[in-house]
Amino acid sequence: MYKRQVSKAVYESIKNSGAKIVDATCPFVLKIHKIVKDASAEGDQIVIIGNEKHPEVEGIMGWSETPVHVVDTVEKAEKLKLDKSKNVRVVSQTTFNYKKFQDLVEIIKKKEYNICISNTICNATEERQNEARRIARRADAMIVIGDSSSSNTRKLYEICKTECQETFYIQTLSGLELDKLKSSDCIGITAGASTPNNIIEEVYTNVRRKLCTDVR
């Protein structure tokens, strides 16, 4: 089985070796590969909103026939310089912070390039982020559950931390310090897409039982 979250060169190398390929890639990622491949073939400059070191972004970069620019901060967006005589195609890492994506795109748009923007953030990711933001605004404390290396969970943490100062990032129940939550009347819980349901339930049940507070 091959998850096509790598460059075109790697994909072609495996294909040419004669190995059987079972492509189990998320369709959202495949869509980005096609957008970048087709746009760059037309000579468009490619801008990816995302983390340059993330495997997904590294893979997307490999599908472009023209130079790729990766932007993930306001500073990089402001410093971005492109050829105004050529079209610009903007895509996003599927798990990128949606609000941050919008903010960075607005900065790039002000540069008056001939730009085409493709919001390629996964719908499920966007909905999860919006829900986490809504809960964090009403909570006294937030618990974000997920693997420390998970991109989408880190984004959830950043969003919650912005809305609720008392936000805690844990991988399992063992990482939760209940003493820090005792003064909270309302505690919100959210989790990354790949976090097992049993871990989420365990955290929820323990917080509810031991703190006897409003948990959302």
Feature locations, PLM:
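Conserved small/polar residues in nucleotide/adenosyl-binding loops
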Residues: 1-2
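C-terminal functional extensions of proteins
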Residues: 141-151, 155-163, 167-216
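A general structural motif
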Residues: 69-75, 94-101, 120-130, 148-149, ...
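Short amphipathic alpha-helix with an adjacent loop that forms part of the alpha/beta core around
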Residues: 75-84, 175-183
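Internal active-site segments that recognize and position negatively charged phosphoryl groups
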Residues: 78-111, 132-135, 144-145
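Internal gly/pro-rich beta-alpha loop/helix module
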Residues: 21-22, 35-41, 46-74, 78-82
